[in-house]
Amino acid sequence: MSSAAESSPTPFGRLLTAMVTPFDADGCVDLALAGRLARYLVDEGSDGLVVCGTTGESPTLSWQEQHQLLGVVRQAVGPGVKVLAGTGSNSTAEAIEATTQAAAVGADGALVVVPYYNKPPQEGLEAHFRAIAQAAPELPLMLYNIPGRTGCSLAPATVARLMECPNVVSFKAASGTTDEVTQLRLQCGSKLAVYSGDDGLLLPMMSVGAVGVVSVASHLVGRRLKAMIEAYLNGQGALALSYHEQLQPLFKALFVTTNPIPVKAALELSGWPVGSPRLPLLPLDPVMRDALSNTLTALCQT
């Protein structure tokens, strides 16, 4: 087992699925299907689910829809499964309200994204996250850094200061580089649980201290991802690497265009009628859909 992986806490388990939000033919949230999908994902190996994150199309869900969806998923999977709510906003007041509401609904944690568009300095980011943490002190927080979408990045030194808040326990690293994990460990030590925000970087990030992943691909290959993680933790590096290489075509196919467009198409192709994304996102175009179908078919044969 990797000593780094062994020494770091895993507050939400190791394999978390960033769950899509199903829509019906009228574009309304399909709560019944969401419950069935949540149970399926857990059966396929997910330790926990992230509801209303990037993959869940949080920017186009109303707060009411988000609270309803969280409640349905919480009830569907029962108390033994970790459920995190995406509660981030570029308004600190909105993020506080969403986070306290998530705690009231029964979330096990909150995924709180770096404020987007308004590009606050590090001092503003620290004040933002500190205010959220203090408003819901009993709810564990996962800070979420994805500069490609937000326009600014949360520095490891800022994260280290935020760990003065006892409920700042984890970090979703989605900057696209393993160095982010290294810098976080150097600044924060092993008490911060760092999760890869990129399926394709899961194994490389675990090798430098990440504890798991917030996954998109686990909608389709949860058992294989769980097997890869377990192989790595059990010292079976060659086996873990074989899973990593086997799954690369799917990882790439799921990000051929903006997430969650491809994964929703893949679920449709796999028999889950989760519907198209809401505007301004569009369904996957036919050429990409055919290529994705071929990738899924090839994966089934391995």
UniProtKB/Swiss-Prot annotation:
GO CC list: cytosol
Pfam family for this entry, one: DHDPS
Record site feature (Part of a proton relay during catalysis), residues: T54, Y117
Binding site for pyruvate: T55, V214
SUPFAM superfamilies: Aldolase
GO-annotated molecular function: 4-hydroxy-tetrahydrodipicolinate synthase activity
Record-annotated active site: Y144, K172
Keywords (A to Z) from UniProt: Amino-acid biosynthesis, Cytoplasm, Diaminopimelate biosynthesis, Lyase, Lysine biosynthesis, Schiff base
Catalysed reactions listed for this entry: L-aspartate 4-semialdehyde + pyruvate = (2S,4S)-4-hydroxy-2,3,4,5-tetrahydrodipicolinate + H2O + H(+)
GO terms under biological process: diaminopimelate biosynthetic process; lysine biosynthetic process via diaminopimelate
Annotated metabolic or biological route of this protein: Amino-acid biosynthesis; L-lysine biosynthesis via DAP pathway; (S)-tetrahydrodipicolinate from L-aspartate: step 3/4
Cellular location(s): Cytoplasm
EC number: 4.3.3.7
Function of the molecule: Catalyzes the condensation of (S)-aspartate-beta-semialdehyde [(S)-ASA] and pyruvate to 4-hydroxy-tetrahydrodipicolinate (HTPA).
NCBIfam families for this protein: dapA
Family: Belongs to the DapA family.
Subunit structure: Homotetramer; dimer of dimers.
UniProt protein name: 4-hydroxy-tetrahydrodipicolinate synthase
Designated gene of the protein: dapA
